[in-house]
Amino acid sequence: MLDKIKELTQTIEDFSIESKEQLEQFRLEYLSKKGKITSMFDGFDFKTVAPEIKKSMGQEMNKLKVLAQTKFEELQDKLNTGSNDNSVYQKIDTSLPVIPNELGGRHPINIVREQIYTVFERMGFNLSDGPEIEDDFHNFTALNFPENHPAREMQDTFFIERNPDIVLRTHTSSVQVRVMENQKPPIRTISPGRVYRNEAISARAHCMFHQIEGLYVDKNVSFADLKNTLYHFSKEMFGKDTQIRFRPSFFPFTEPSAEMDISCFICNGKGCNICKQSGWVEIGGAGMLDPNVLINAKIDPKVYSGFAFGMGIERITMLKYQIKDLRLFTENDVRFLRQFKHAE
């Protein structure tokens, strides 16, 4: 019996492991209810030991049990910390080349959006947000879109099949309607966000993109205020030498309406591929709020007037960083995105 205890003691002391499976094997073999140590206590050999040595024999067996438990904890610690030279947790070889762990950066759309917001924030504009799933009233009717307007067709707008009155917003002008409904003039706000159009995805178009639209409503607001606001924005965003021009246009929610161009900051107005040799690049649309839009928001157009403007963030980003394919913004190509890690 003593020889068996000595043999088990030596085996336990010399036991080593390289995996969790071997650790579990040790536990089952020596510490479980059916293990070797428990079997010795319950076995025939121990029961037949002479009474005068049974006490000392029991003490030796208890020492063996304590040794097994201690050894198990020691092996467990070594496995967890990787301090066992033979374990699967190998020591770190400091001579090996380091695998670079690069930190992420901001997306170019976010960079430009924050730049735009910073400029307008300095001019006293606050930030507004609204739902991307919008109802027909806020997306079309309140903005003076007639019933037969092409934007209401399925070719241009994503409608919810179960409820045709619900759409994916086609512009963030719907946010401006909600602001006017819930806030009394003076109102000065910008509303950036995702918008959706039923368009085929290509290098120049996408079904989802980002807009930022501005709204100013107060007494005696004029087109001159609109021009000065966008003039200041253009110089802050694209450089102090930037010039702007307005071309007559049409939008249902503004009258008069205009398209805004800026002098090409790539060629300084001399003509290049970016501006198609014209010296000008289109940035967005703007105009004075149509009185019907104010009436729909329960604002008296005889007392208040206002202007609105909108521009595509992707377009500004593409111009600013000379990006030629719109799809790059949504493809998550790390080679493309890492170029903007330190962009300003």
Curated annotation (Swiss-Prot):
InterPro entries: aa-tRNA-synth_II, aa-tRNA-synth_II/BPL/LPL, Phe-tRNA-synth_IIc_asu, Phe-tRNA_ligase_II_N, Phe_tRNA_ligase_alpha1_bac, Phenylalanyl-tRNA_Synthase, tRNA-bd_arm
Complex formation: Tetramer of two alpha and two beta subunits.
Binding site for Mg(2+): 255
Enzyme class, first EC level, given as a word: ligase
Catalytic activity: tRNA(Phe) + L-phenylalanine + ATP = L-phenylalanyl-tRNA(Phe) + AMP + diphosphate + H(+)
Cofactor(s) this protein requires: Mg(2+)
A GO CC term attached to the entry: cytoplasm
PROSITE patterns in the record: AA_TRNA_LIGASE_II (PS50862)
Pfam families cross-referenced by the UniProt entry: Phe_tRNA-synt_N, tRNA-synt_2d
One GO molecular-function entry: tRNA binding
Cofactor binding, note field: Binds 2 magnesium ions per tetramer.
Main location, first listed in the record: cytoplasm
Enzyme Commission number, as recorded: 6.1.1.20
Similarity field: Belongs to the class-II aminoacyl-tRNA synthetase family. Phe-tRNA synthetase alpha subunit type 1 subfamily.
Gene name per UniProt: pheS
Cellular location(s): Cytoplasm
GO biological process: phenylalanyl-tRNA aminoacylation
Organism: Cytophaga hutchinsonii (strain ATCC 33406 / DSM 1761 / CIP 103989 / NBRC 15051 / NCIMB 9469 / D465)
NCBIfam families registered for this protein in UniProt: pheS (TIGR00468)
Protein name: Phenylalanine--tRNA ligase alpha subunit
Key words, A-Z: Aminoacyl-tRNA synthetase, ATP-binding, Cytoplasm, Ligase, Magnesium, Metal-binding, Nucleotide-binding, Protein biosynthesis
